[in-house]
Amino acid sequence: MGRFKIRAVDGPHDFTKFTETMKRIVLMGATSGIGLALAERLAADGHRIGVAGRKTEVMRELQKRYPEQIVYSRIDVTDAEAPRKLHDLIERLGGMDVYFHIAGIGFTNEALETDRELLTMQTNVVGFTRMVDTAFRYFRDHGGRGHIGAITSVAGTKGIAQIAAYSASKRFQQTYLTALEQLARRQRLQIRFTDIRPGWIRTPLLDADQEYPMSMTLGYAVPRIHRAMVSGRRVATVDWRWRLLTAVWRLIPDALWVRMRIPISTIASEAQTRRNETAAEAPLKRLEGPAPTASQKGPDAKPAVATADSTAKPKV
């Protein structure tokens, strides 16, 4: 990611730096992988977190670990009732300064099984739009300022055959965030936008029996995602290798791109599969440990994230 620094945003989008005060942050999709690790890190930083997802037991354990920082709600972004539940969560949180959308799904689907393609779109396009729009309207109606962020993907750079619906849905998310930023400027709203585009991250999203090129562990990726959230960068690609690769991808004409075979994964050894399975559960295993003491909490606490040598499962 390179050297980290916070940059001021001039004009109507200038507002208090993320790290200077406690923030009320809603994490949509924070019951596994990136979202869960990020929730732990932000709670340890002293922020108040509204955790939303589908795994109630995970959220309950997270609240036990950080009882003063965490409130939670079971929310499925594909449910029409999700916006109402989000507003209820915001009320219990005491308001919202930051909305961060992590919820997503994806399949390797060369057979083009329609149910899988539509489920991906229902979650990553319809659900994403439903929740991000709700957050935008909330900020518009409550002072006209806030921060909307999302985990999109490097897969949104180009259409990728094996993950057609996934790559298309991520391109939609990136374009939609740009459109909302333009809308915020037209309406003179102080809403900031962050589009975080990771490469492969070892999370439970994909199969443990596969090896993915240039994959990253949660312990490596989450601090970089955290930096991107609090920095002034509009778009952040994680990490530098993927920044270089996607820069090359953009230079390739579509007429040539469609003739290329883009490798997604290879079969992992049995030993590596076991390591992947173990590491994918790392954030959940941490919740089974003892709760942190008061001295471990607050802005000076050491972030609770996976170690850099852990190997959890990839997300594009």
What is the meaning of each model-derived region?
Residues 36, 182-242:
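SDR active-site lid
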Residues 153:
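Residue(s) in the substrate-gating loop at a strand-loop-helix junction
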Residues 109-122:
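Short alpha-helical oligomerization interface
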Residues 66-81:
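Rossmann-fold cofactor-recognition segment
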Residues 132, 169:
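Active-site helix of classical SDR
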Residues 31-32:
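Conserved glycine-rich cofactor-binding loop
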Residues 102-108:
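Conserved NAD(P)H cofactor-binding loop of Rossmann-fold oxidoreductase domains
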